[in-house]
Amino acid sequence: MQKKLAIGIDIGGTNIRTALVDASGAVVGIRTQPTHAEREITEIMGDIAQGIGMLMSAHTVSRETVRGIGLGAPGFLSLRAGVIHNSPNLPTAREARVVSLVQSLTGLPVFLENDANAAAIGEHWVGAGQGARNLLCVTLGTGVGSGFILNHAIWHGSNDLAGELGHTVLVPDGLPCTCGRKGCLEAYVSATGIVNRTASALRAGRSSSLDACNKPGNPLTSLAVYEHAQRGDRLARDIFEETGRYLGIALANVLNLLDLEMIIIGGRVARAGDMLLQPAIHEVNTMALRAAYHPVHILQARLGDHAGVIGAAKTVFDRV
């Protein structure tokens, strides 16, 4: 029987998504399970292997029909060695040989990919980036993930560390970032950055209906900032406009460096839509040199939470 399916896995700090994906990029079946990231990485990988078995059983899929497993993981990776060196979202994953571990548990070929790269691969294959030769896919969530497609292929760089747009410095000596440095883009445009900047403005005395959302037992969230912005709260709207401007400045810098034809924006922060994207597009059109001669296509991602698993599965189809 032809091996027509691949398994794509997207490991997040909160949840793990596991999907059966066919050769056209369609998701045949998917399941979500909690990560419980504080556990030993061997336990997490064991849960992943068990989840794969449960998903295959639920869809009556035999091992013989599966080409392999694509493992999308966060952190600093060595793809050929199959190792997670370090990952803020997986604190016990230090020099973790996850590929050999999952292979031994499942008996299937396993291929490792950065989670943000996997999302970019998915969007390029069957999402908003179909047909584009050169693009950037940015995922705005708790942090900022990004992946570059150059000449129709994901760009890994010399040491599998390319694409860390979130840790390019936007403001010298600016806000502290989770990486330990100051002024990174992630500290300004991620969900965490939105919350921190809003809380700082409230502490400084800005008047806002968000005051009620910043109390003990009722922590401030980026969703609350968005909802209050929709209702017309001035501070909340200013925060999202400023977030869009910061994002647009970073994207214009990338365009001036790489002359990309398309930028895709995904993740839960991007669900703010025009409130975020319009100020970003304005900055790009003002600051990107190519904007004077060629249109810059900035699009919202299409695949949502499926982008990572679809892209991870594509890494299998590309190799087996």
Segments the model singles out, each with a brief description of its role:
Residues N159, T168-V169:
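Zn2+-dependent cytidine deaminase-like catalytic core
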Residues N89-P91, F111-N117, C137-L140, L299-D305:
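Active-site nucleophile and cofactor-binding loops and adjacent substrate-binding regions
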Residues R31-Q33, P88, S158:
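Short hydrophobic alpha-helix segments
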Residues P34-H36, T92-A93, A162-E164:
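A short acidic/small-residue loop/turn micro-motif
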Residues M1-G68, S78-V83, V99-L108, G122-A132, ...:
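ATP-binding/phosphotransfer module of carbohydrate and carboxylate kinases, centering on a glycine-rich
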Residues D10, G70-P74, E113, C137-G143, ...:
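Short beta-strand segments
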Residues G82-R94:
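A charged helix-plus-loop insertion that forms the helical arch/lid used to bind
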